[in-house]
Amino acid sequence: MLIERILNKLPIIKKLPRRVAKPIFVMIIFFDELFWKLRIFIFVLVFGKENKIGKALSDLKKTGVAVIPKFYSDNEVLKIKKECIKQLDELPFEKLDTNEYIENLLVKFNGNDLRLERLGKSIKLKGLHYINSFFRKIGRDFKTSLINLIYHLDFSKPFLIYNITHDGSFVHPAFSKSFKSEIDMIAGKPHVDRSIHQLRFLLALDDVKEENGPTVCYKKSMHLNEIKKNHLNLLLEKFNFEADGGGSHFVNEEKLKFLEKKANKIHATVNRGDLMLLDLKTVHYASPLKSGERHILWYYY
């Protein structure tokens, strides 16, 4: 995204005293917020809240999370899911025959390097758009590109991540038979990912209900002063400055208690083909899967 790229080109900030750099970060967050609100206001004013994209952007502005129902048809989603599962067949199973957490395994697909993360019965295969033209087309339609332009001020293409989590019912050599019965979760702790407004999309390849682990979001949490401290700390740490107290990426227990009282915690259940949009300043986490399987495709920007 545009602001992220600008920040990455400002290493000189690391050479400044912390007392000088901190106010700069406060101003960056302030102006990002101001122009983000302005962009959404103009789009909604022109196209209205009855427009699917307009409604989604309006919901994002208010709560930090939105769902566009039936963004993809059942046939389209089934094709995507089939292709995702097909990629599991190409994994180096001998390297996956372990009970240990695999954080960042390099795997080759058609000469391209992809990354794999596995924890228990959950796998993330990262970089599917590098594999073939089928995946490269995903997330490049007009509606998705328009949302990306409004939110990020650029035409960047999504980084695709396939995530499968199951209770043992999904039989495949990519999952060792010796796993414990507990279902561990990748990204299972409440956290915020960004200090400036940035989107992540979740495409539901199957229905995601209470039993198979929906993403949990704290509505309006990004607008709370307690969480804004986390946003500032993320920027401080990005430029190698000491963070203020209260946490940065992860939300500590004290703030969680605060959120339970002040924010509306929702389990973002979605149907197959729905597209969930999440502002990464919002506190969220992956809830434990109780039974069944969960297949989702993440779009990272």
Enumerate the language-model features and the residues they cover.
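Short conserved catalytic/interaction loops centered on acidic-Pro-aromatic/His motifs
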Residues: T215, A286-H295
